[in-house]
Amino acid sequence: MKITHITTYRLPPRWMFLKIETDEGVVGWGEPVIEGRARTVEAAVHEFADYLIGKDPARINDLWQVMYRAGFYRGGPIMMSAIAGIDQALWDIKGKVLNAPVWQLMGGLVRDKIKAYSWVGGDRPADVIDGIEKLRGIGFDTFKLNGCEEMGVIDNSRAVDAAVNTVAQIREAFGSEIEFGLDFHGRVSAPMAKVLIKELEPYRPLFIEEPVLAEQAEYYPRLAAQTHIPIAAGERMFSRFEFKRVLDAGGLAILQPDLSHAGGITECYKIAGMAEAYDVALAPHCPLGPIALAACLHIDFVSRNAVFQEQSMGIHYNKGAELLDFVKNKEDFSMDGGFFKPLTKPGLGVDIDEARVIELSKSAPDWRNPLWRHADGSVAEW
């Protein structure tokens, strides 16, 4: 079997799919994208195609190493996201050829189900509470919400009070009936993260995500030393070599590699194993589409240290398409009591509606993340 063609489709809301075709008619799908930089990743995918056309798709490990090492310059969000989507599609092909789901090819299940959590938006505490109540109605009891809005390097007590007030009202409204993580989104400087974490500790969040940017990872162990709240990070780390450094430094309780940013299934399985060796939990980052989610689920079901799975159903970014709009076998992604079950169809287990993909790719928006500014006019972290 040989790879004959690679096609990319930029899609709403902010996704990109790729299709790898073979000379035997077997097709694999992947989801390579950096949100807001889809065209750049698309260019990288087609550059990698030069290494792939005419090659045997079954040699996933070798093709991964070729894409990673054949260029003198490597790594980073663009290149690793391009590799990630290609890698997903290669695993999809292998599973279809062998008539087995990817988790079966990786040694089989370590669990029967995995807890899903849902992002909750809202500018006011009442909006967040209303969103949680609606999601509880369809079975969710675990959530993630923004821990704060933009925050100055050294900010005032009003900004701290606003963040704490939202969390306090949520805990008061639901008590211990729900769990929620707080995503700082890298918006907070290390000095302000110390203040916020201390003030939030009485409300027992499930985790604090990206309390500081990945570029400031040296602060993770320092922040972890001052709190009992688990610290989570990893969505902006792109290879096992970056994760190696933070695992060795300590401080993180939960790793959140993104299966569409960190080299795909091949690389993230290695990252999961590294995390287990350090007694660190795994919770793959996934605010993206159905192929990315499927890839995450296969890793969850073969990694003992996986604890829960993010998914984007109803997320505020989803303008123009929802999580399963491009999927024919929607029933396979249904949740029972807030848990996903293993996907059982061969390959990734996603039956893509190719006609719909082609149609909506004709008018895909160029999504950009917001540009925020502080009151003094300086650029703020989004």
Swiss-Prot record:
Q: In which pathway does it act?
A: Carbohydrate acid metabolism; D-galactonate degradation; D-glyceraldehyde 3-phosphate and pyruvate from D-galactonate: step 1/3
Q: Which keywords does the record carry?
A: Lyase, Magnesium, Metal-binding
EC numbers for this chain:
4.2.1.6
Give the cofactors, semicolon-separated: Mg(2+)
GO MF, one example: hydro-lyase activity
The reactions it catalyses are: D-galactonate = 2-dehydro-3-deoxy-D-galactonate + H2O
Give residues annotated as binding Mg(2+). Answer: D183, E209, E235
Give the first-level EC class, as a single word: lyase
Signal peptide per UniProt: none
Looking up Pfam families in the UniProt record yields:
MR_MLE_C (PF13378), MR_MLE_N (PF02746)
Q: How is the cofactor bound?
A: Binds 1 Mg(2+) ion per subunit.
**CDD domains, per this entry?**
D-galactonate_dehydratase
Also noted in the record is:
Reaction proceeds via an anti dehydration.
UniProt function note: Catalyzes the dehydration of D-galactonate to 2-keto-3-deoxy-D-galactonate.
Record family assignment: Belongs to the mandelate racemase/muconate lactonizing enzyme family. GalD subfamily.
Name under which the protein is recorded:
D-galactonate dehydratase
Q: Where does this protein come from, organism-wise?
A: Salmonella typhimurium (strain LT2 / SGSC1412 / ATCC 700720)
